[in-house]
Curated annotation (Swiss-Prot):
The keyword Repeat does not apply. Pathway: Protein modification; lipoprotein biosynthesis (signal peptide cleavage). Belongs to the peptidase A8 family. The lineage of its organism: Bacteria, Bacillati, Bacillota, Bacilli, Bacillales. The gene is lspA. HAMAP family: LspA. This is Lipoprotein signal peptidase.
Length: 160
């Protein structure tokens, strides 16, 4: 699917990137590394944290691996968006969120050599790993894509 509908998903990705980069800029500009501001005591904090790895700090310092994987994933998402049918809006929204999240963290890796994380939540006494807007968009995007695939996807004609 080219045209107007694809543009909507790219605009969604651009909005995610803008919000992600703006919030990270605020954290870097106005908070000390390790500083934590309670939003809801024992539940939600804004905590200035840096991550040189993948989700939850895995694969620390493997920059070239992240660069390569991100370029491949972004290209795949763009190809998938272009092939969507007009009825596959949920998949398009999921892919737009994933695209924005992937590019948001990629920008950090390229320009900062680390990812700025700042959303720190607790589930009971469990301290969930610190994350950011891009991570959230990626997670929600993957969930939406799975919902689409398992509940709404229909086989293309000729592939049944």
């Amino acid at each position: 699917m080219g045209g107007f509908r694809a543009v909507i998903y790219y605009l969604l990705a651009a909005a995610v990137i803008a919000l992600d980069q703006w919030t990270k800029w605020l954290v870097v500009r106005y908070m000390q590394l390790g500083e934590s501001i309670p939003m809801i005591d024992n539940v939600l904090y804004i905590t200035s944290h840096r991550n040189r790895g993948a989700a939850w700090g895995m694969l620390q310092g493997q920059f070239w691996l992240f660069y390569l994987v991100t370029v491949i994933v972004v290209a795949g998402i763009i190809i998938y968006i272009r092939r969507l049918r007009p009825s596959e809006r949920l998949a398009g929204i999921g892919l737009g969120l994933m695209l924005g999240g992937a590019i948001g963290n990629f920008i950090d890796r390229v320009f900062r050599k680390e990812v700025v994380d700042f959303i720190h939540t607790y589930i009971g006494t469990y301290s969930f790993p610190v994350f950011n807007i891009a991570d959230s968009a990626l997670t929600v995007g993957v969930i939406l894509l799975f919902i689409h695939m398992f509940f709404f996807a229909t086989p293309e004609k000729g592939n049944e």
